[in-house]
């Protein structure tokens, strides 16, 4: 990540909006923003493979659900945050991931400029590709600051997105069971 370019760009934005980039409260802002971007965009170029490849053998194939995984990310359209909760269900095929690995999967894909729909897809596809699940179902509920702070200005509006893979695509009863277990 080119932090010098980020700092220069932030200084230009500060000046472009009519502020003095050298005043006391803004002098360190370009460096702060560059450090923040290093942190919140740390998922760029990463996949969840390293997390999901550490799995455990299991002999049954009962559904695993992890819900209320808090995340925050940046909308790639306005570079404003959106945040919420991800709910994950999957059907193992002989292997299960450690529970923290599901949260880490959400984290990897949320640490980059993102849209909610793609975040759903990336998490579900990672479960299928790297864990070898028989099915994956991901529901994300989020509030988007680009809707709350600007434009339509409707704070508190929740956007829900879903994606189903494998067995969840074809089995409505299985999806319904996942919804119930997720409390949705």
From Swiss-Prot:
This is GTP cyclohydrolase 1. Homomer. GO terms for biological process: one-carbon metabolic process; tetrahydrobiopterin biosynthetic process; tetrahydrofolate biosynthetic process. The keyword Oxidoreductase does not apply. Pathway: Cofactor biosynthesis; 7,8-dihydroneopterin triphosphate biosynthesis; 7,8-dihydroneopterin triphosphate from GTP: step 1/1. Its EC number is 3.5.4.16. Keywords: GTP-binding, Hydrolase, Metal-binding, Nucleotide-binding, One-carbon metabolism, Zinc. Zn(2+) binds at residues 75, 78, 146. One of its GO terms (cellular component) is cytoplasm. Pfam families: GTP_cyclohydroI (PF01227). HAMAP family: FolE. Gene3D superfamilies: 1.10.286.10, 3.30.1130.10. It comes from Streptococcus pneumoniae (strain Hungary19A-6). Belongs to the GTP cyclohydrolase I family. The keyword ATP-binding does not apply. It catalyses: GTP + H2O = 7,8-dihydroneopterin 3'-triphosphate + formate + H(+). GO terms for molecular function: GTP binding; GTP cyclohydrolase I activity; zinc ion binding. Coiled coil: none annotated.
